[in-house]
């Protein structure tokens, strides 16, 4: 397990060697893998934002010999999927000619309230055999609007959206930077160590350089 840090000022040094130092020293999970299966009756299209260099073949999820990411104490992992609900027009993918994407009633019976199914594998530090956790992604967990979503979700969307815009993502044409900035400000929260304020300053600096 290793970590790469970029230290550009005193505040960053305090973060790396102070508040975040123990997070890199104490591993809590090795070879963490995440897999999501979407219900094709409810989701017609989906895509994972980022993680292009961390993608695994489907069959490698259950293969404990395939390495994956390690997680330290205090770290968290966020995966953002963009989905298109079934029946919504203007998708990016043409309808299938053979083998329609909509599942048969027999296959979907009992899963009408599930957008998908999440599976997570990890190894305890020093062990060779992985452990499996799983849970359905329920319709009842959805929110009618982004503004009604939990603060952590709104923050993650703001950061992910800005990352897409900054790198010139093919799907970022309609992203409004000012709207993302306001979204991040509203989801800033307590911000004990000032990291979120630093992100807001970064948005401001990049926008000034662009203009």
Q: Regions from the language model: what does each represent?
A:
Residues 26-28, 40, 110-112:
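A generic structural signal for short, solvent-exposed coil/turn residues
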Residues 8-37:
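C-terminal helix of von Willebrand factor
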Residues 26-33, 44-46, 89-94:
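Acidic/polar loop patches that form or flank catalytic/metal-binding clefts of enzymes
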Residues 43, 51-78, 83-211:
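Long, acidic serine/threonine- and proline-rich intrinsically disordered regions
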Residues 36-50:
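Soluble, acidic/polar mature domains that operate outside membranes
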């Amino acid at each position: 397990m290793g970590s790469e840090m970029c230290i550009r000022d005193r505040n960053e040094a305090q973060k790396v060697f102070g508040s975040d130092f123990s997070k890199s020293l104490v591993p809590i999970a090795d070879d963490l893998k995440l897999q999501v299966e979407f219900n094709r009756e409810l989701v017609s299209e989906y895509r994972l934002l980022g993680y292009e260099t961390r993608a695994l073949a489907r069959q490698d999820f259950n293969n404990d010999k395939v390495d994956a990411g390690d997680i330290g104490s205090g770290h968290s992992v966020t995966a953002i999927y963009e989905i298109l609900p079934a029946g919504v027009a203007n998708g990016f993918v043409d309808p299938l000619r053979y083998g329609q994407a909509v599942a048969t009633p027999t296959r979907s019976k009992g899963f009408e309230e599930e957008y998908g199914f999440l599976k997570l594998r990890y190894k305890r530090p020093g062990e060779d055999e992985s452990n499996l956790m799983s849970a359905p992604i329920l319709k009842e967990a959805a929110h009618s609007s982004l503004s009604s979503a939990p603060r952590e979700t709104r923050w993650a969307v703001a950061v992910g959206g800005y990352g897409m815009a900054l790198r010139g993502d093919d799907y970022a044409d309609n992203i409004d930077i000012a709207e993302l900035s306001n979204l991040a400000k509203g989801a800033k929260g307590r911000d004990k160590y000032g990291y979120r304020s630093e992100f807001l300053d970064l948005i401001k600096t990049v926008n000034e350089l662009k203009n």
